[in-house]
Regions:
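Short, Lys/Arg-enriched N-terminal segment that forms or immediately precedes the first helix
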Residues: 2-17
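Extended, well-structured beta-strand/loop surface patches
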Residues: 8-11, 66-71
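N-terminal helix-turn-helix DNA-binding core of bacterial DNA-binding proteins
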Residues: 15-57
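Short, aromatic/basic-enriched loop-to-helix "N-cap" motif that marks the start
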Residues: 55, 81-82
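Basic amphipathic alpha-helical segments that dock to polyanions
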Residues: 58-60, 64-65
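Beta-hairpin "wing" of winged helix-turn-helix
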Residues: 68-81, 87
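Basic, amphipathic "hinge/linker" alpha-helix immediately C-terminal to the N-terminal HTH DNA-binding motif
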Residues: 82-99
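Amphipathic alpha-helical dimerization/coiled-coil segments
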Residues: 94-112
Length: 112
């Protein structure tokens, strides 16, 4: 019978995963607002910030952000290869603005 109760270590790990996933989404919104990115570029950019994630994690996040209207996906033929570029939408820019306000508020409170 599988243990129904999580250990503190499991709970901690799950909570950290949820935090990092939120941070990753913010990074994606920010960077795609600067210029169009394709998946591999975003993965490399996130790695510069210390996030190690698989394509199996990245692409579902990108697809969800597109489905919710925060990103736009555009296919381009680059040297005979189809690449999907992601760009921040107006709705995504509005959300990012709200997130930035909340981040500033949180940092001001926590770091005071």
């Amino acid at each position: 019978m599988k243990n129904r109760f999580r250990t503190k270590k499991d709970s901690h790990r799950q909570l950290m995963k949820e935090f990092f996933l939120g941070f990753i989404k913010i990074h994606i919104l920010y960077h795609t607002g600067e210029r169009p990115f394709y998946g591999q570029e975003l993965k490399e950019e996130l790695e510069k910030h210390g996030y190690s994630l698989s394509y199996g994690t990245l692409y579902p996040v990108l697809h969800k952000l597109c489905d919710e209207g925060y990103l736009r996906r555009e296919e381009k033929n680059v040297e005979g290869k189809i690449r999907k570029y992601y760009t921040l939408t107006e709705q995504g820019a509005h959300l990012l603005g709200q997130v930035k306000e909340k981040i500033k508020e949180l940092v001001d409170e926590v770091m005071d």
